[in-house]
Amino acid sequence: MGCDGGTIPKRHELVKGPKKVEKVDKDAELVAQWNYCTLSQEILRRPIVACELGRLYNKDAVIEFLLDKSAEKALGKAASHIKSIKNVTELKLSDNPAWEGDKGNTKGDKHDDLQRARFICPVVGLEMNGRHRFCFLRCCGCVFSERALKEIKAEVCHTCGAAFQEDDVIVLNGTNEDVDVLKARMEERRLRAKLEKKTKKPKAAESVSKPDVSEEAPGPSKVKTGKPEETSLDSREKKNNLAPKSAATNESFSGKAGKPLCGATKRSIADSEESEAYKSLFTTHSSAKRSKEESAHWVTHTSYCF
C-alpha cells in the first residue's frame, strides 16, 4: 500500500484541486506604489509629478509618453487619462533627514528597512511610506499627510500659504473608492473647462467685430446744426473767394527770378562815393560805353559793351 521507503501518500497529494488565490504581499505593494514610477516602473526621482487620480510619476516619463505618437504605447492604460502636461502637478516634497538611501547598505551586510521613506510630512513629521494617507494640493503642489489636514483645519496651505478649495485636495495612492471619487471630479472639471471655452469663443468673435464698426466712424459723433445744403454752399463760396487772393499772392511772390522784392536794395555803382579808378572797373562807367562807330563790327562783344 505504501510507496518505496514505507511512505503512504495522501489524497490531496494525488488529486489536483482548485488553485489557491495568491495573496499579494502588502509590504511589497506599498514599496512599489510609493517608490516607483507608475508609468515607467523606475525608481522615483525628482522632478516627481502626480496626476488627478493620485498616482506618482517621473516627469521625464510623462513627457516621453506624451511625445510618443506610436499606436502601441507601453503601459498606456496607466496614463491614458493624461492628455497634456497640464494634467499633472509637480510635487513639492519634504526630505526625510533619517533616510540614508543606497549609502546605508553599500556592502550588503545590513537589513534594508523598507518602511523607511524618502519624504515626510512637513507639518506632522509622518513618513510617506504608505502606512499613512497623504494628499497634495492641485493648486500649489505641496504634499502633507491627511492627519495634518484634519487636525489643522484651514483654507490656506500649511506650507506655502496658498488658498485652496476642497476640490483641490487629491489623495495620493488612494483606495479604489478614492480613485472613483477623484475620477468623477476629474471628468466634471474637464467638462466645465470645455463649457467655459465654448462661452469664450462667441465673446472673442464679438470683440473682433467691434473694431470694424469703430473704423467706419472713429471718435465721438458731432451733431451738426443748421441745414447741410446751406453749409456746403457757404463753404464753396469761401473757397472761390480765397482762390483769387491766393493766385495774386503767388504771382507777387513768383515775379521774375533773381529780382529782389524791395527796390532799396538795388543801387548803381555810379551813385557811390568811390574813386573814379574803382568805378572804371564796372560796365556802368562812362569809359566802358562805346559808340557803334568806335566798336568794330567783326569783334564779338557782349551786351555789356552798350
From Swiss-Prot:
Subcellular location: Chromosome
Domain of life: Eukaryota
Phosphoserine PTM sites in chain numbering: 287
MF annotations from Gene Ontology: DNA binding
Cysteines engaged in disulfide bonds, as pairs: none
UniProt biased composition (Basic and acidic residues): 226-240
Record's keyword annotation contains Metal-binding: no
Region (Disordered): 193-276
Post-translational modification summary for this protein: Undergoes proteasomal degradation, via DDI1 and DDI2. Removal from stalled replisomes and degradation are required for genome stability.
Database matches in CDD domains: RING-like_Rtf2
Keywords carried by this UniProt record: Chromosome, Phosphoprotein
Subunit-structure text: Interacts with DDI2; probably also interacts with DDI1.
Stated role: Replication termination factor which is a component of the elongating replisome. Required for ATR pathway signaling upon DNA damage and has a positive activity during DNA replication. Might function to facilitate fork pausing at replication fork barriers like the rDNA. May be globally required to stimulate ATR signaling after the fork stalls or encounters a lesion. Interacts with nascent DNA.
Protein name per UniProt: Replication termination factor 2
Underlying gene: RTF2
